Design a protein with these regions (language model features):
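C-terminal structural segments of small proteins and small subunits
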Residues: 66-68, 72-90
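Short S/T/G/P-rich N-terminal loop/turn motif that feeds into the first structured element of a domain
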Residues: 1-54, 58-70, 93-97
Length: 97
């Protein structure tokens, strides 16, 4: 069962955030992750969507997503995101039918 990282972000400093984008991809790939959504056009259909940037990353399983988030590889990259954006992030298990 896949694991997903879902983040909804407001980028406060786009120039500095670019460093995060450049560095995070290799860490995601190392743990078998792939981007499904990375910003892009959207339309809010119901409720409120607080931040303009949404990211969805798929990992082979839930544990791999957690392993990536807590990894030594992601550890030095994470503060760049935190310093240059506000928002929410979850790691969630996918379903199988």
């Amino acid at each position: 069962m896949s694991g997903f990282v879902i983040a909804n972000l407001n980028i406060k400093n786009p120039d500095a955030y670019k460093e995060y984008v450049d560095k995070v991809v290799a860490t995601i790939k190392k743990f078998g992750g792939e981007y499904l959504v990375r910003a892009g056009e959207y339309k809010v259909m119901e409720g409120e969507w607080k931040n303009p940037r949404t990211v969805v990353i798929k990992f082979p399983n839930y544990d791999k997503a957690l392993e990536w988030y807590n990894s030594e590889e992601y550890k030095p990259v994470k503060p760049i995101r935190l310093a240059n954006s506000d928002g929410n992030m979850i790691i969630i298990k996918g379903v199988t039918w």
